[in-house]
Design a protein with these regions (language model features):
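Acidic, His- and aromatic-enriched active-site or binding-groove loops in soluble protein domains
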Residues: 74-85
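Feature targets compositionally biased, intrinsically disordered low-complexity regions
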Residues: 63-65, 83, 135
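Substrate-binding clefts and catalytic carboxylate motifs of secreted carbohydrate-active enzymes
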Residues: 25, 86-90, 94-192
Length: 192
């Protein structure tokens, strides 16, 4: 398997190495594995093609990793550092939106560019009017369960209000999260 990954990298570089938008590469997304191996792979990638920036993983939940860059990382993709959160999810669970804070405290001692991983992902109430649009394997069992639950509780008439209110909240949370990132001088970017 490991040799396949090295070979796959070689094929990617051969096919896309000169593409102008190929400027960064991660070994994978949310990897939980042997980080010595991942660092070795990044070292190999840098030796093979040094024209771009590399990172071991686009975030990880692996214990002992993910709060600071790995030794071979040219950039760091995470939800938090060892100093705190760099994405709203962990902050907005603890405090209300305030629109004047940033992520500077969590960025202290960061020696490579940092990108916040998968910001947002705020839940919005489903639009139950869309149920009939789904057919075949796309049957919206989750939407149907929500509809049945609302009907059982006598709240079905509120479904559109729930949709609108949750959508407005998601907009406010995205707005603050993106503004916090943009206000943080050391911040390098974010992924939606």
């Amino acid at each position: 398997m490991t040799q396949f990954l090295y070979n796959e990298f070689d094929r990617i570089v051969e096919a896309y190495g000169n593409h102008p938008s190929f400027c960064m590469m991660s070994v994978g997304n949310e990897l939980q594995y042997d980080f010595k191996l991942l660092n070795d792979m990044v070292r190999y990638m840098k030796g093979k093609d040094s024209r771009r920036l590399y990172t071991t993983s686009t975030f990880t939940f692996e214990k002992g990793h993910g709060a600071k860059p790995e030794p071979e990382d040219d950039f760091f993709v995470t939800q938090w550092t060892d100093k705190g959160w760099v994405r709203g999810q962990g902050i907005f669970d603890q405090e209300p939106p305030c629109f004047y804070k940033d992520y500077s405290a969590a960025m202290q001692d960061m020696n490579v560019p940092l990108i916040s991983h998968e910001i947002g992902q705020y839940a919005v109430f489903p639009n139950l009017k869309e149920i009939e649009k789904y057919t075949g394997v796309l049957e919206p069992l989750n939407f149907k369960a929500v509809k049945q639950d609302l009907q059982k509780k006598g709240l079905y008439s509120k479904a559109e209000d729930f949709l609108e209110a949750s959508g407005k909240l998601a907009v406010l949370l995205y707005k603050e999260e993106i503004e916090r990132a943009m206000k943080t001088k050391q911040f390098s970017g974010f992924q939606l």
